């Protein structure tokens, strides 16, 4: 009964999200013309993360591929329990602040994980399991305005999906390899078992006047710190970090998106007729309590490895915007995630966003 009730509520919420994209009153979508108000539009994005982008070789290892398509509504009025959730005052920094804007988001995502050796059909006990994760993400985003502390972006996210053969990792990876003429991964018979996945994540990013753009060699420099907490049978962790941006005219937004784990910014960006760009570098540290792709299934015995509880990501990237489009690329260096891992991982994240 509880599972049926939860599924019914999630179905209603998803229907509400889709309906809202097409029925948001015009009063919440002010005309922008050629101005640079960033948050009056609705936004969409498609994103690909792959180790090919970082290694420039036709190989697969560990987190090898991620796909995501997402939508973020224009500002809307929320009421009832959605409004209550969106305005929860999580501590730290919200003194003398008020919610200025609410958005809802919907994303479809797929991630694939493999061991280092994908040629073997045997169970590789010292290497990470094969696994895939297909899920829908429902997002409540709130911008808080504070006279003294700037702008805060809070995002509550619920991920609902499935890990295991039902997620289609073998089908996606091997059919793609057939298409491009690459070797198939042979060990998918050893993958994680089917398991429903549920994760709840809270993210906060700060755009503080204390970190407002300063000048360096004629360019602007600023920082955006953030924190994240995730709880679920797929991933449980606490994290924090930030990015430093460098460019001719830094936009008043929160940077490009990323596929979890790892805090991204937002699909929302500055819409302007002028071409703009910036470079960024960042770091994120996570304390990991659970990772199903290392710990194995929660409800069944499965292949697992001894995970590391402290993981860090280093990032370098670039963003370009023109009119209602944004293109970003992020190179991620991720420290070792389990005890028998031979070397750190690298992958690239390419995202194309658009405003409408």
Predicted regions and their residues:
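Short loop/turn motifs that connect adjacent beta-strands in outer-membrane beta-barrel proteins
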Residues: 30-41, 75-102, 144-155, 208-223, ...
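Residues that define the transmembrane beta-barrel architecture of outer-membrane proteins
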Residues: 61-67, 130-134, 154, 194-200, ...
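Transmembrane beta-barrel strands of outer-membrane/channel proteins
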Residues: 44-50, 104-112, 158-164, 204, ...
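Outer membrane beta-barrel transmembrane domains
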Residues: 116-118, 243-356
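Short glycine/proline- and aromatic-enriched beta-strand/turn motifs that initiate or cap beta-hairpins
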Residues: 29-77, 108, 113-118, 288-294, ...
């Amino acid at each position: 009964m509880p599972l049926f009730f939860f599924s019914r509520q999630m179905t209603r919420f998803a229907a509400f999200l889709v309906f809202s994209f097409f029925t948001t009153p015009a009063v919440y979508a002010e005309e922008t013309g050629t101005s640079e108000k960033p948050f009056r539009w609705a936004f969409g994005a498609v994103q690909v993360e792959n180790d090919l982008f970082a290694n420039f070789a036709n190989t697969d290892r560990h987190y090898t591929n991620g796909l995501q398509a997402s939508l973020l509504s224009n500002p809307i009025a929320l009421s009832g329990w959605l409004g209550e959730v969106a305005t929860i005052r999580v501590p730290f920094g919200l003194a003398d602040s008020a919610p200025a804007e609410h958005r809802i988001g919907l994303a479809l995502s797929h991630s694939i994980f493999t061991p280092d050796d994908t040629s073997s059909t045997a169970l590789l006990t010292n290497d990470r399991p094969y696994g895939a994760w297909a899920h829908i993400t429902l997002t409540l985003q709130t911008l808080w305005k504070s006279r003294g502390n700037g702008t805060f972006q809070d995002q509550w996210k619920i991920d609902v999906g499935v890990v295991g053969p039902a997620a289609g990792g073998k089908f996606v990876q091997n059919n793609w390899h057939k298409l491009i003429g690459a070797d198939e991964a042979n060990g998918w018979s050893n993958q994680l078992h089917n398991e429903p996945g549920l994760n709840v994540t809270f993210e906060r990013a700060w755009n503080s006047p204390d970190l407002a753009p300063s000048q360096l060699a004629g360019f602007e420099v600023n920082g955006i710190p953030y924190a994240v907490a995730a709880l679920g049978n797929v991933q449980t962790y606490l994290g924090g970090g930030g990015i430093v941006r460098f460019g001719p005219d830094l936009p008043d937004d929160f940077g490009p998106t990323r596929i979890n784990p790892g805090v991204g910014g937002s699909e929302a960006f500055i819409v302007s007729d002028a071409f703009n760009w910036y470079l960024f570098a960042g770091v994120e540290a996570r304390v990991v309590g659970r990772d199903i792709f290392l710990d194995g299934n929660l409800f069944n015995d499965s292949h697992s490895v001894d995970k590391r509880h402290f993981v860090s990501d280093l990032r370098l990237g670039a963003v370009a915007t023109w009119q209602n489009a944004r293109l970003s690329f992020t190179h991620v260096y991720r420290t070792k995630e389990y005890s028998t891992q031979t070397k750190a991982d690298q992958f690239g994240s390419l995202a194309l966003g658009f405003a409408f």
